[in-house]
């Protein structure tokens, strides 16, 4: 081992890999006047108008209702998956399903069902059912603490009347968290044509209507911040019923589209066009070395860049929500809530419009979103920390010599 301390060793390797990533990273800014465009974007927040409010409200309602139905169905399916989660086939199937992002599922179902509500719902339900199934199973297992002599012989009765009620608060808490995630996921489905908030966000950005962009973002923040008031044990049943009534254009299964998808759309070119062996090898070589390998390499570089940026952001900003460093952490909480409530795709899209295509928009988006989450977690952890009696009163010394060494291991765990 390079250093005796494990955290120092990990940090050294992390920084070294980050430096190498910077060498290969494309951080260019290709827009003609990026700072002028940035100032226009942030300056437009004071010029919000409601001329397009009817379109935005419709998209907002679509976003909310799709997310409600998706999480309702996903939680039911997830619970059944959790019951049979011990099966290796189920575990592998769920792992594969949840590893595919909802945007990719949306692109698949758009080819089969077209641009409608059903495609959007399936794009959320399939990966979220797999995620909920895995986490529900883990929650049920963690709460299965009763000794064998108290379980009785009827396993079904034990499961329904003892195991589930004991774990129920944790199941509900995680489902509510996933509902917040579903709102963000549904919003970004607009980038592929579904009429949710992301659809109008993309349209207004392309047209330079930044005041409308801010209206969308502010409405989305309000929805996220008030979830506990409009989606709780008293309102979720009426909300589910209202969502089914509100949503329209469910579409229908087109056999022709389904056949075309499996017999043409996803069939590799060598099989579709009957390539010769040499042409097939050339096709595969180009695909492997010019697209797959390049994509994998760029993904690794962006990941390492975003980790470096995230680490710096979290270490700089966790004090703004820590009572050890600020007497009024409220405004720091608001700042971090806004950042972590904004989907990474929306942040990346904003930076893409401001700075042009490169690795910079993705790295900055991941930094702000993930950095805000880690800052919030670390800041809350420091609030529970008991300081030594002889601790210094100077903030910088308290940060470097008292707080940071004690939370650094947990910080690395959150980061990786």
Model-derived regions: residue spans:
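Hydrophobic alpha-helical transmembrane segments of polytopic membrane proteins
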Residues: 197-232
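Membrane-cytosol interface at the C-terminal ends of specific transmembrane alpha-helices
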Residues: 117-178, 182-185, 357-416
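Transmembrane alpha-helices and adjacent helix-loop boundaries
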Residues: 31, 40-47, 88-89, 99-106, ...
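Cytoplasmic-entry segments and transmembrane alpha-helices of multi-pass inner-membrane transporters
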Residues: 80-108, 138-139, 297, 316-351, ...
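A structural signal for multi-pass alpha-helical bundles of membrane permease subunits
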Residues: 19-32, 98, 106-114, 177-180, ...
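N-terminal, non-cleaved signal-anchor transmembrane helix
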Residues: 1-84, 88-91, 220-333
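Alpha-helical transmembrane segments of multi-pass membrane proteins
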Residues: 58-70, 94-98, 102, 137, ...
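Loop-to-helix entry region at the N-terminal start of transmembrane alpha-helices
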Residues: 58-66, 101-131, 290-303, 340-375
């Amino acid at each position: 081992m390079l250093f005796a301390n494990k955290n120092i060793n990990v940090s050294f390797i992390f920084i070294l890999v980050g430096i190498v990533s910077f060498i290969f990273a494309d951080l260019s800014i290709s827009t003609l006047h990026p700072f002028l465009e940035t100032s226009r974007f942030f300056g437009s927040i004071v010029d919000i108008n409601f001329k397009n409010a009817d379109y935005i409200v419709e998209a907002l309602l679509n976003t909310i209702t799709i997310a409600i139905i998706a999480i309702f169905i996903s939680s039911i399916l997830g619970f059944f998956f959790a019951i049979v989660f011990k099966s290796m086939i189920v575990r592998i199937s769920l792992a594969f399903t949840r590893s595919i992002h909802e945007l990719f599922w949306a692109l698949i179902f758009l080819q089969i069902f077209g641009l409608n509500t059903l495609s959007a719902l399936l794009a959320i339900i399939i990966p979220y059912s797999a995620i909920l199934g895995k986490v529900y199973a883990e929650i049920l297992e963690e709460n299965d603490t009763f000794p064998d002599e108290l379980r009785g012989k009827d396993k079904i009765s034990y499961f329904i009347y003892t195991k589930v009620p004991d774990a129920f608060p944790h199941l509900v808490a995680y489902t509510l968290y996933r509902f917040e995630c579903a709102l963000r996921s549904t919003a970004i489905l607009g980038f592929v044509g579904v009429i949710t908030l992301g659809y109008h966000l993309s349209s207004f950005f392309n047209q330079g209507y930044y005041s409308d962009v801010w209206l969308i973002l502010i409405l989305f923040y309000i929805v996220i911040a008030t979830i506990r008031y409009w989606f709780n044990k008293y309102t979720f049943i009426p909300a589910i019923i209202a969502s089914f009534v509100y949503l329209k254009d469910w579409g229908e299964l087109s056999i022709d589209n389904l056949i075309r998808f499996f017999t043409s759309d996803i069939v590799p070119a060598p099989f579709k066009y009957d390539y010769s062996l040499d042409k097939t090898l050339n096709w595969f070589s180009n695909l492997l070395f010019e697209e797959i390998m390049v994509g994998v390499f760029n993904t690794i570089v962006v990941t390492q860049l975003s980790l470096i940026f995230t680490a710096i952001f979290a270490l700089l900003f966790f004090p703004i929500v820590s009572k050890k460093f600020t007497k009024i952490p409220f405004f720091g909480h608001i700042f971090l809530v806004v950042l972590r409530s904004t989907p990474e795709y929306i942040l990346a899209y904003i930076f893409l419009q401001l700075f042009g295509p490169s690795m910079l928009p993705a790295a900055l988006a991941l930094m702000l979103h993930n950095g805000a989450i880690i800052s919030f977690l670390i800041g809350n952890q420091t609030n529970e920390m008991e300081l030594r009696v002889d601790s210094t009163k100077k903030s910088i010394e308290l940060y470097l010599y008292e707080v940071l060494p004690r939370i650094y291991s947990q910080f690395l765990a959150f980061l990786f």
